[in-house]
């Protein structure tokens, strides 16, 4: 992949496996898919960067960049953007691990192509995850019009006999939303993370589970990359090569995105509840 892809793995609370998912996804893409990966650990605990350091590989560079949050200050935002720009410069894929706090504006999420939000399958956690994502979408509607960002929910620490309960129905209306294969709750999994990346451990259940998750995310990354390349090619084809006229009209992304809007259909109860979400962000 020549075009850089930036992934943010975030949630508002701990205990859902965010850092271990970040470290293991970085290892999977770097080793299994042979890409240069940069892992940026924005959490003070430095868990994900520590895990990557224990299982070092030449394709992975990890950086610890704990943020100092200052209320009503833009300094944190500037520091976060600067760290992302600096540490992603030479990577094919950048993965940022960040526990979200409202000391950081939602604008920072726009620096990323993919958002991955880990969540347990408890009713409270599912509701919290849905609210977190929908608030972000609602507050950033205009910017999301011009950025085809992918939102993935990663069910984490899920018992295999509860897979049917993993539903995020409040997000199904979003066009670029998908739910990842769940990360299972396995008794030995926390011990294995200290030994090696999950996809390489001897425990077949753990390794196959991580490969399924990693392959799904990588497929979405490839899909997004191809979409960006197609859009770039379309823009280049529409703009006259030999045109040097100063008043030549500028073609914007919205000219193309507007074509994808669907005709309004009779609203269901779910559509009425989320009527604030415009057609260009809704799943067709």
Residue ranges and their predicted role:
Residues 1-10:
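Extreme N-terminal, non-catalytic leader segments
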Residues 10-12, 16, 25, 31-95, ...:
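P-loop/Walker-type NTP enzyme "switch/lid" segment
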Residues 105-123:
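Inter-motif core of Ras-like GTPase G domains
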Residues 129-145:
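Conserved C-terminal guanine-recognition region of P-loop GTPase G domains, centered on the G4
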Residues 157-202:
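Beta-strand-loop-alpha "switch" segments that mediate conformational coupling across diverse proteins
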Residues 202-228:
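Histidine-centered active-site loop/cap adjacent to the catalytic His
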Residues 252-284:
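Long, low-complexity, intrinsically disordered segments
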């Amino acid at each position: 992949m020549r075009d850089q892809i930036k992934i943010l793995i975030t949630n508002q609370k701990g205990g859902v496996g965010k850092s271990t998912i970040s470290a293991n996804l970085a290892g999977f893409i770097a080793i299994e898919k042979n890409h240069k990966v940069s892992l940026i650990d924005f959490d003070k605990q430095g868990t994900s960067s520590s895990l990557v350091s224990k299982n070092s590989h030449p394709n992975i560079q990890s950086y610890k960049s704990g943020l100092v949050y200052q209320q009503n200050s833009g300094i944190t935002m500037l520091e976060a953007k600067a760290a992302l720009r600096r540490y992603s410069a030479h990577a094919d894929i950048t993965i940022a691990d960040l526990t979200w706090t409202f000391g950081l504006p939602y604008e920072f999420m726009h620096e990323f192509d993919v958002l991955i939000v880990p969540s347990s399958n408890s009713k409270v956690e599912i509701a919290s995850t849905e609210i977190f994502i929908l608030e972000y979408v609602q507050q950033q509607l205009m910017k999301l019009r011009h950025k085809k960002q992918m939102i993935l929910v990663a069910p984490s620490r899920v018992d295999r006999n509860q897979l049917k309960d993993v539903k995020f129905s409040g997000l199904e209306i979003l066009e670029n939303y998908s739910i990842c294969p769940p990360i299972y709750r396995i008794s030995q999994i926390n011990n294995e993370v200290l030994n090696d990346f999950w996809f390489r451990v001897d425990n077949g259940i753990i390794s196959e589970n991580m490969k399924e998750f990693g392959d799904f995310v990588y497929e979405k990354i490839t899909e997004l990359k191809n979409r960006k390349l197609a859009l770039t090619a379309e823009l280049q084809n529409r703009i006259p090569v030999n045109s040097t006229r100063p008043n030549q009209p500028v073609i914007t992304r919205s000219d193309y995105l507007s074509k994808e809007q669907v005709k309004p259909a009779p609203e269901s109860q779910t559509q009425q509840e989320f009527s604030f979400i415009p057609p260009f962000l809704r799943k067709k």
